[in-house]
């Protein structure tokens, strides 16, 4: 039996590094349309774009997407998802997958994977994905979020800092990956149950979340388990900078 889940794609017009990001053209389409099309290729029963901007609503309706206008004052993307789930009237046990609106090359198969992982791990309130880190510079890049899990695949913590800190290895050489340390980069895709989203909003931000600017730390702070699996297909580059945009344009326009 196929798994029933809803994909929500948050799309905000304001971006400090790349203004107007969701509507930037790539191969003749706005970026958010590419994300929507990839999500539609997954097993999701419904794909919804959530935005706080009327121009994005208009653009999304033009290419046939279901789109909802949300409040503009949400603390995080997860808070926005909670509003969408309420607008859609989803049941507390329904599964919602958050697919970032700046991932025009997101593999549909990992959207299915993260939804299935949550369904298969009832002890977890959230499921998410990671991939191995192979380049030493990625460990020290604050834009690459690192995750460490326990032996059961449950997250111990996430950080923008090098995590774990290989004290002896880094004291000698930071240009090589420490031997025997499985560094992993977090992939910013989440599956939630709607009931959890309601709790998440009620808690409000915690100091650790605000310090790292990582909303998933709010869940860990409140004792929620996060299941982390290695993605079965590595995602291509997301779009955070003008350089990322040009790279994706070259890939899709080739």
Swiss-Prot record:
Its recorded name reads: 3-deoxy-manno-octulosonate cytidylyltransferase
- Reactions listed under catalytic activity: 3-deoxy-alpha-D-manno-oct-2-ulosonate + CTP = CMP-3-deoxy-beta-D-manno-octulosonate + diphosphate
One Gene Ontology cellular component annotation held by this UniProt entry:
cytosol
Q: State the Gene Ontology terms under molecular function.
A: 3-deoxy-manno-octulosonate cytidylyltransferase activity
Q: Which family does it belong to?
A: Belongs to the KdsB family.
**Gene this chain is encoded by:** kdsB
* Pathway it works in: Nucleotide-sugar biosynthesis; CMP-3-deoxy-D-manno-octulosonate biosynthesis; CMP-3-deoxy-D-manno-octulosonate from 3-deoxy-D-manno-octulosonate and CTP: step 1/1; Bacterial outer membrane biogenesis; lipopolysaccharide biosynthesis
Pfam families listed in its UniProt record: CTP_transf_3
Which organism is this protein's natural source? Pseudomonas entomophila (strain L48)
- Return the EC number: 2.7.7.38
**What GO biological process terms does the UniProt entry carry, in alphabetical order?**
CMP-keto-3-deoxy-D-manno-octulosonic acid biosynthetic process; lipopolysaccharide biosynthetic process
Q: Which NCBIfam families does its entry note?
A: kdsB, PRK05450.1-3, PRK05450.1-5, PRK13368.1
Q: Where in the cell is it found?
A: Cytoplasm
Question: What taxonomic classification does the UniProt entry list for its organism?
Answer: Bacteria, Pseudomonadati, Pseudomonadota, Gammaproteobacteria, Pseudomonadales
First-listed, main subcellular location of the protein, grouped into a coarse class: cytoplasm
Report the superkingdom from the record.
Bacteria
Which top class of enzyme applies to this chain?
transferase
Question: What are the record keywords, sorted?
Answer: Cytoplasm, Lipopolysaccharide biosynthesis, Nucleotidyltransferase, Transferase
Where does the UniProt annotation place the signal sequence?
Answer: none
What does this protein do, in the record's words? Activates KDO (a required 8-carbon sugar) for incorporation into bacterial lipopolysaccharide in Gram-negative bacteria.
């Amino acid at each position: 039996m196929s798994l029933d889940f809803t994909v929500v794609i948050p799309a905000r017009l304001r971006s400090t590094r790349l203004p107007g990001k969701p509507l930037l053209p790539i191969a003749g389409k706005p970026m958010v349309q590419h994300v929507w099309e990839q999500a539609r290729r997954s097993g999701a029963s419904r794909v919804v774009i959530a935005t706080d901007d009327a121009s994005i609503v208009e653009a999304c309706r033009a290419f046939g997407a279901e789109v909802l206008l949300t409040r503009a004052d949400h603390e995080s993307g997860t808070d926005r998802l909670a509003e969408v789930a309420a607008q859609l009237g989803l049941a507390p046990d329904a599964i919602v997958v958050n697919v970032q609106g700046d991932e025009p090359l997101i593999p549909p198969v990992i959207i299915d994977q993260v939804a299935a992982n949550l369904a298969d791990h009832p002890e977890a309130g959230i499921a998410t994905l990671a991939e191995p880190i192979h380049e030493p510079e990625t460990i020290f890049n604050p834009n690459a979020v690192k995750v460490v899990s326990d032996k059961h695949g449950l997250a111990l913590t996430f950080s923008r800092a090098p995590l774990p800190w290989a004290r002896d290895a880094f004291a000698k050489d930071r240009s090589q990956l420490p031997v025997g340390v499985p560094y992993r980069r977090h992939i910013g895709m989440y599956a939630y149950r709607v009931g959890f989203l309601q709790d998440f909003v009620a808690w409000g931000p915690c100091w650790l979340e605000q310090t790292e600017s990582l909303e998933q730390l709010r869940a860990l702070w409140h004792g929620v388990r996060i299941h982390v699996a290695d993605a079965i297909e590595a995602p291509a580059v997301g779009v955070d900078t003008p350089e990322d945009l040009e790279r994706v344009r070259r890939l899709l326009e080739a």
